[in-house]
């Protein structure tokens, strides 16, 4: 049943910062530039942030008048040319936040963005460039000698590297949560909207709501999950002061999207990784967990499958599967003071009651439900104890915690020594992982927003009937989560997550009616596309945490990697070791400063003077906790009560308070996703459309030979893949390198912030950026001697690919058909050469083509009924009269036929 609810689209998507000597004016507007908001920032305060939001929605004319008055009021001398009192400082696409070190505040703005994915018409952008502006005026600035050093440390966090945001889609939550909120009962939405208005009434915010009546649409905006928000500390100072549309929450991790073309039907495969901002850091400096249950290198990976034929969240088909990686939830670390490739693992603190593990798993129960499945990939048998220390402690912690849980909600522990199986020549690592993946997906299920297809009901599959999760009238819900870990949670973990994701992808495709069995084979276009997404996902996460790309990939464990891969693995190992030894400490300081773990304070030790950051991440070492959790009832009672459903998705008073509900007219811009996606008010280039530029299975993976099966689920031979028919070796390497670099950043040109007042200048800049397509292969100049080889290479594939060679002459039959086509076109457009108007003497010779069909040229508004002959009319009238009891007399032929029938039947 369609719901009358939609996500609220932010009305602040374009920003222009204007500057005077005393103030900054930040003007924000929506994409159509029909609604504006204004922030006023005081520049006369040396250390405090004074920001005013009048919460009024301006029109374009009102904003121009306001800026004109500000310009006139800030001129130094009346009538003096070239001395405008209002300067345009910078254009932007969003506010990252405000930060202060030892002097005044800085504002961080997003000045460049790139579209990375599209989910139901909701665009996901990657931050491409930022600008950091000091707010106080130079006349009131109080300088400090260490300010520049803090600024350099803060800017070491590269905001142009894998930071993502959206104006309408909550990236901190899963697709299951976002769609569950939209499907809430209307009665609860009405009550929540009334309660919100009673608690905080705003004359500007609620203006016009009372007169809307019952024909409106509920707009819903959910509170972000702050664990995965990376600029929460930067926005905290203005959260209670400004309108919510100014708050742009940013996640860190990975986002990639590819198009699976199934016989012309586009299906988008999206991979989103959310890196936790709690206990974040680099490889050897952040291990285990902190006192609050947050673990190092915790990443939530979600794969989303959607039918791109329908854009709406309510009418479209969407499916998702979520899994998690993270360090072993214990107090452990590795000493990097000694120059060793594998520093020894030490347990820093005894935890016999598994206190930190209890906090961690309680958080997982609340967000994901049950069962929680742990896939532990660390080594179990070693000559010298190293990784086995973690396995023994983790088993003891899980065993202790399971004593007090209900039997149906106990934590499932799966140990598997992946390194041992990899060294064995008789064991296939991926086959064993596939068995584990099947059992995991059957227990957790996955999310899909539509009921089972009718074809799956007619032809049920055994595996489908055994699938777990929660079945609801509108589809299925994923209950529970797979938590995968090794020591670093990088190479082995990424391969294991790929195999589980591949298994879940088969079920997702089956649930949408795209395949007949929930099973996918290797060496198909679909799996190759999915594998490339996961490799880019693993490389990105490995660079963020370990300082290098993946060392061991899926092909390594399949044992089909070429011999050159071994040298690349060695280089990645050396790169990771160098990064861990020399640059991780500086990166850790930058992360601590960016996330607000450390706050510079006058008179206290500086960040670089601290011997360790242990006390920054473990708050209980500096003060006593007000309350201590029970060692037996270690869970939250409300969370256990609603299992296997995740408590965050249960409709209750606590969760309803996290929602902002507002009623809109049906076609208002705040909820009109069609207007937001297509932007009819903008002139856009068809070649730069995101859906055409993204990686496609048909263009990038399917072989180009004639007569090939176009299905992306057909198993290809290694020499039949799309990559093997790209031409000679150099061209093939260039194409592969280009696709690898563009996999994590789709090709459409990034948008650079421009304002409406300088459209002429901005158009030139944007054309220069987007003039060279990133999909084009670099052209190499050839000598004259090589022209014959080049011609041969071009002509030969044309015959193989298209079955025709243009160098051969046309046959007589083809030539006559083409000549007839040309003559037909010339006769239709006869004109006098000296005049642009058709000549009168030629009008008689113009061929008038009329359709030979019996039907007229109808349209959707009017249909002309066809002519019916007399005999057909009489038959129809006799049929109508027969239904009324008026029978027609039988003819001679009918009477003789009936007599013959009676004679043969009874006589």
From Swiss-Prot:
Quote the catalytic activity from the record: a 1,2-diacyl-sn-glycero-3-phospho-(1D-myo-inositol-3,5-bisphosphate) + H2O = a 1,2-diacyl-sn-glycero-3-phospho-(1D-myo-inositol-3-phosphate) + phosphate; a 1,2-diacyl-sn-glycero-3-phospho-(1D-myo-inositol-4,5-bisphosphate) + H2O = a 1,2-diacyl-sn-glycero-3-phospho-(1D-myo-inositol 4-phosphate) + phosphate; a 1,2-diacyl-sn-glycero-3-phospho-(1D-myo-inositol-3,4,5-trisphosphate) + H2O = a 1,2-diacyl-sn-glycero-3-phospho-(1D-myo-inositol-3,4-bisphosphate) + phosphate; O-phospho-L-seryl-[protein] + H2O = L-seryl-[protein] + phosphate
Major enzyme class: hydrolase
Chain intervals for the UniProt region annotation (Disordered)? 707-788
EC number(s) given by UniProt: 3.1.3.-, 3.1.3.36, 3.1.3.86, 3.1.3.16
**UniProt entry tagged with the keyword Cell wall biogenesis/degradation:** no
Instruction: Quote the subcellular location field of this record.
Output: Endosome membrane
Q: Which GO terms describe its cellular component?
A: early endosome membrane; endosome membrane; Golgi membrane; intracellular membrane-bounded organelle; late endosome membrane; lipid droplet; recycling endosome
Boundaries of every SAC domain copy? 154-547
The record's section on InterPro entries has: Fig4-like, SAC_dom
Give, from the UniProt record, the effect of changing residue 41 to T.
In CMT4J; the mutant protein is unstable; low levels of the protein results from impaired interaction with VAC14
Q: Does the keyword Membrane apply?
A: yes
Q: Which GO terms describe its molecular function?
A: phosphatidylinositol-3,4,5-trisphosphate 5-phosphatase activity; phosphatidylinositol-3,5-bisphosphate 5-phosphatase activity; phosphatidylinositol-3-phosphate phosphatase activity; phosphatidylinositol-4,5-bisphosphate 5-phosphatase activity; phosphatidylinositol-4-phosphate phosphatase activity; protein serine/threonine phosphatase activity
Please list every transmembrane segment annotated in the UniProt record, as residue ranges.
none
Q: Where is the composition biased (Acidic residues)?
A: 758-770
Disulphides: none
One of the protein's GO biological processes: neuron development
Q: Name one Pfam family in it.
A: Syja_N
Q: What does this gene product do? A: Dual specificity phosphatase component of the PI(3,5)P2 regulatory complex which regulates both the synthesis and turnover of phosphatidylinositol 3,5-bisphosphate (PtdIns(3,5)P2). Catalyzes the dephosphorylation of phosphatidylinositol 3,5-bisphosphate (PtdIns(3,5)P2) to form phosphatidylinositol 3-phosphate. Has serine-protein phosphatase activity acting on PIKfyve to stimulate its lipid kinase activity, its catalytically activity being required for maximal PI(3,5)P2 production.
According to the record's subunit comment, the protein's assembly and interactions are: Component of the PI(3,5)P2 regulatory complex/PAS complex, at least composed of PIKFYVE, FIG4 and VAC14. VAC14 nucleates the assembly of the complex and serves as a scaffold by pentamerizing into a star-shaped structure, which can bind a single copy each of PIKFYVE and FIG4 and coordinates their activities.
Protein name per UniProt: Polyphosphoinositide phosphatase
Species of the source:
Homo sapiens
Q: Which gene encodes it?
A: FIG4
């Amino acid at each position: 049943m369609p719901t009358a609810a939609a996500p609220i689209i932010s009305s602040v998507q374009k920003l222009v910062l204007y500057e005077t000597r005393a103030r900054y004016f930040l003007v924000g507007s929506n994409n159509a530039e029909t609604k504006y908001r204004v922030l006023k920032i005081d520049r006369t305060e040396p250390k405090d942030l004074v920001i005013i939001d009048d919460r009024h929605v301006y029109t374009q004319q009102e904003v121009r008048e306001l800026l004109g008055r500000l310009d006139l009021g800030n001129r130094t001398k009346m009538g003096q040319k070239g001395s405008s009192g209002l300067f345009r400082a910078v254009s932007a696409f969003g506010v990252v936040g405000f930060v202060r070190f030892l002097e005044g505040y800085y504002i961080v703005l997003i000045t460049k963005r790139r579209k990375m994915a599209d989910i139901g018409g909701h665009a996901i952008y990657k931050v491409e460039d930022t600008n950091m502006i000091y707010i106080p005026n130079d006349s009131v600035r109080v300088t400090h000698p260490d300010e520049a050093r803090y600024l350099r440390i803060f800017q070491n966090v590269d905001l142009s590297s894998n930071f993502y945001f959206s104006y309408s889609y909550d990236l901190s939550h899963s697709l299951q949560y976002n769609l569950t909120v939209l499907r809430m009962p209307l009665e609860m939405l009405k009550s929540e909207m009334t309660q919100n208005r009673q608690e905080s009434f705003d004359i500007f915010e609620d203006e016009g709501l009372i007169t809307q009546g019952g024909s409106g649409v509920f707009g819903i905006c959910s509170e972000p999950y702050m664990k995965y928000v990376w600029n929460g500390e930067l926005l905290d100072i203005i959260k209670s002061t400004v309108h919510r549309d100014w708050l742009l929450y940013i996640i860190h991790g990975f986002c990639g999207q590819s198009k699976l073309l199934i016989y012309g039907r586009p299906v988008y495969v999206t991979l989103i990784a959310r890196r936790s901002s709690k206990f974040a850091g680099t490889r050897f400096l952040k291990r285990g967990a902190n006192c609050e249950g947050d673990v190092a290198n915790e990443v939530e990976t979600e794969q989303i499958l959607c039918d791109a034929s329908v854009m709406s969240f309510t009418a479209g088909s969407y499916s998702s599967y979520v899994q998690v990686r993270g360090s072993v939830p214990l107090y452990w670390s590795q000493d990097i003071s000694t120059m060793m490739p594998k520093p020894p693992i030490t347990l820093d603190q005894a935890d016999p009651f598994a206190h930190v593990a209890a906090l961690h798993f309680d958080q997982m129960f609340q967000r994901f439900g049950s069962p929680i499945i742990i896939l532990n990939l660390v080594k179990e048998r070693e000559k010298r104890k190293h990784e086995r220390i973690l396995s023994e402690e983790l088993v003891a912690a899980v065993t202790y915690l399971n004593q007090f849980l209900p039997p149906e909600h106990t934590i499932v522990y799966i140990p598997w020594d992946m390194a041992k199986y990899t060294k064995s020549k008789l064991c296939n690592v991926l086959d064993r992982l596939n068995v584990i993946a099947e059992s995991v997906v059957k227990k957790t299920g996955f999310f899909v927003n539509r009921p089972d297809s009718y074809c799956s009901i007619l032809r049920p599959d055994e595996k489908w009937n055994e699938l777990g999760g929660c079945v609801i009238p509108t589809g299925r819900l994923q209950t529970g989560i797979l938590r995968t870990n090794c020591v670093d949670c990088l190479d082995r973990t990424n391969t294991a997550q790929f195999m589980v994701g591949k298994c879940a992808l088969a079920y997702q495709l089956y649930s949408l009616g795209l395949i007949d069995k929930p099973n996918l084979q290797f060496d198909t276009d679909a799996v190759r596309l999915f594998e490339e997404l996961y490799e880019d996902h693993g490389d990105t996460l490995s660079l963020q945490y370990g300082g290098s790309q993946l060392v061991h990939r899926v092909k390594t464990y399949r044992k089909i990697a070429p011999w050159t891969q071994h040298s690349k693995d060695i280089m990645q190992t050396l790169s990771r070791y160098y990064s861990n030894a020399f640059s991780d400490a500086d990166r850790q300081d930058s992360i601590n400063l960016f996330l607000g773990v450390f706050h510079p304070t006058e008179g206290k030790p500086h960040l670089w003077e601290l011997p360790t950051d242990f006390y920054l991440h473990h708050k209980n070492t500096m003060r006593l906790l007000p309350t201590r959790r029970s060692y037996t009832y270690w869970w939250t009672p409300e969370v256990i009560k609603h299992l296997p459903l995740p408590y965050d998705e249960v409709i209750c008073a606590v969760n309803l308070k996290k929602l902002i509900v507002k009623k809109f007219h049906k076609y208002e811009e705040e909820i009109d996703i069609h207007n937001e996606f297509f932007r009819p008010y903008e002139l856009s280039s068809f070649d730069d459309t995101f859906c055409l530029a993204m990686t496609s299975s048909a263009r990038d993976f399917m072989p180009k030979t004639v007569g090939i099966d176009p299905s992306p689920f057909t198993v290809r031979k290694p020499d039949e893949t799309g990559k093997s028919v790209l031409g000679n070796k150099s061209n093939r390497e260039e194409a592969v390198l280009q696709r690898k670099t563009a996999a994590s950043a789709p090709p459409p040109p990034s948008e650079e912030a421009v304002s409406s007042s300088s459209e002429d200048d901005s158009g030139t800049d944007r054309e220069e950026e987007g003039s060279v397509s990133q999909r084009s292969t670099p052209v190499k100049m050839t000598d004259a001697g090589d022209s014959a080889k080049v011609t041969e290479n071009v002509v030969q594939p044309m015959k193989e690919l298209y079955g025709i060679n243009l160098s051969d002459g046309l046959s007589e039959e083809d030539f006559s058909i083409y000549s007839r086509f040309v003559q037909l076109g010339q006769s239709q457009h006869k004109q006098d050469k000296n005049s642009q108007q058709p000549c009168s003497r030629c009008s008689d010779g113009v061929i008038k083509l009329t359709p030979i069909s019996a039907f007229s040229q109808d349209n959707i508004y009017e249909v002309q009924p066809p002519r019916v002959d007399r005999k057909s009319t009489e038959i129809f009238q006799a049929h109508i009269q027969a239904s009324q009891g008026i029978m027609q007399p039988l003819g001679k032929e009918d009477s003789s036929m009936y007599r013959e029938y009676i004679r043969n039947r009874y006589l």
